[in-house]
């Protein structure tokens, strides 16, 4: 794999850290309601690793490089927050184990699932996480968005 090229002076100036008028409330919101996380963050499928949350950890552990705009780096940090989250009464989301979020609504007879993710291993891991921490329920409806 080729090493990334350094930022040009123009890019460095454009991406220089600065006050963008954003506070840390978004980080508090992104973490609010987290109940649990996948034990390893690595979701295995029949063809190998389907998702690996640790591959996104670098955005939380390192400084913004001069090749990335500060607002994009911040968005990547917010997106790196993962796990099972309480959203509202009888509504939970699993975030950060696919390119989208999966929502679980506690129905009278089981889970109503909204947006079942893009691959089965991630959806299975999300369902397992919900069942483990919220109680085992069957899936009774799936809504694709």
Question: PLM features: residue spans?
Answer:
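Conserved beta-strand hairpin/beta-sheet module of binuclear metal-dependent hydrolase folds
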Residues: 77-137
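N-terminal pre-domain segments of enzymes
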Residues: 1-81
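Residue-identity detector for threonine
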Residues: 8-11, 40, 67, 103, ...
